[in-house]
Structure formats: structure tokens, C-alpha cells
Amino acid sequence: MAIITSRTNKNGRITFIYDRCNSCGLCVNVCKDFSLIMEDNKPVVSSHPLFGCIACGQCMAVCPNKAIDISGREMSVDDLIDLSGMKNKTSYDQFKNLIVGRRSIRDFKEQKIEEELIDQIIEAAVSAPMGLPPSDVHLVVLKGKDKVREFSFDVLDYFRKISWVFSDRMIWIWWLAGNETYKLMKSFAQPLVRFLAETKDKGENYLLYDAPLAMYFTASPYSDPADPYIAATYAMLAAESLGLGSCMIGSVHPTIQYGAGKLKRKWNIPYKSPSGIVVIFGYPKYRFKSGIKRSFANVTYFAN
């Protein structure tokens, strides 16, 4: 039985071009669904896979002779990217410089972002790994300061509509979700909602900061909840490499996740989305001279 997503309910189809095949068996080795086996010294499609081909493309990508064609589940042989000419892969030092130098940017120049850069950011984001192919991430792209502001104010209007949940009389209800949730709502969500409402009344946008570009990544109910966050991270790093600043905004999705039907219909946001994140982009107004060394809450090692 095929694994269902919002985009497909079929298995991928594996076709061998045997006059190109050298029977090396690499395709069989990399297929963790066990969709492929060696039989009579050649790879064939197994009749007893784990799930059935999910069209991850691993077998097609590892084949040295282009002897495999995957189709279905939004995959085709045309999706192959030749890696033989990619000689300038990023070194660790280059990558570290990129991530250490990146700051969360909320102050932007009054400068539009070129369409070419927007396309490059999306191109990088769609290459992010996902829990199950094909990607079930949905993306809303808001181009231009005015469109970002319009979306922001629509969200802030909804914030105001549900602000009673964060009032002094009702904030206690979050105890039902646990002590940690209550403390987070009391110390963060309650003052944030009040601040955003007050500043919106003054025509100020402290939700998405009047960025010239925003992208809203959401997951479908079928996808891994982490998928939109990973895609958003790829987009953020791509933007940094292109000279743009960015910042993740996590307050939008949890607030509108279980309601805001009118808003979601207007902005083509999937109604039932378990997770989501907004990223804002723009040319940084200020340049930072230093990076910040970070740490995890804890790191535990286990070794042989």
C-alpha cells in the first residue's frame, strides 16, 4: 500500500534500462524500502517491499549509467541534477563563516528584493530534506513591503480577536496545558499580544517589521512537522549567501493554527497545518561587527 501524502496516493514506478545496466548492485544497496533486489545477477523490482517505492530517487541518483527511471509521486528522470560538474562545494570553514556571521535581521533598507534572488531562495528551500517525499511543504510568498504589511495587519487583527485568552482574567487557563506552558504564555505571549495590538493601532508593524519579502512555510497533516522548519532554514541560509538578512517569526502559525479561517482562505494557507514558520527577508539596514557564540542546553555523548 502506498504511503499517502496530500500530493499523491500512489507508489513510484521503477523502470530499468537493462542495456545500460552493469549489474553493480548500487541501487539495491541504497534502497532502504527493499523495493529492489538482485535476481539472476541483475536488479529487479521486489514483490515484497517495505512500503513500496516512495520515489526518494536514491537508486536513480546513485546509478553510474543512468539505467534507472523513476516516475510517479511527483518524480521523473528529468529531475536528476548532474553533480559531475560541481567542483566548488562549500568547505567547513566557508560554511562556518556563513552561519556565524548570520544575525536575525529586523531592520531593513527601503530596497526591493530582485526576482532572481527570490527564485534562488525558493530553489534552495525546495532542496531541503523532508520526512517523506514528495515534500508536503506549502509556501506562501509575500513580495513587497505593502503586501507584507497587509498580511501582518490581518494577522494582528486576529490576534486582537483572540486576545481575551491572554487577559489577566483568563491567562490562568494555560495551567491546564502544563506549568511550563503557563509560564511561557504569562512571560512571553501575554505581553507580546498586548504590545503588537498597541503598536498596530499606531500603524507600526512589529510582527513582520515591514520587510520587503516574507515566506510562510507550512506542513500538511501527512508530513513530518519538522519539514517546514528545515525548508525555512535552507531559505534563510540561501538568503545569507546572497547578501540578504533574514529572521524567523514563530508567533504567526501557533496563533492562527486552529482558527482564522477567513484569513487562511484569503492568503491560501492550508487550513489543517500542524506546523509552520514565517521568514522575513531584506537588505540589512545595519551591519554587525561581531558574531555570538551559542550553546545547547545540554550535550550528552555515548560512545563504544
Q: What does each of the following model-derived ranges do?
A:
Residues 2-304:
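Acidic, surface-exposed loops and disordered segments
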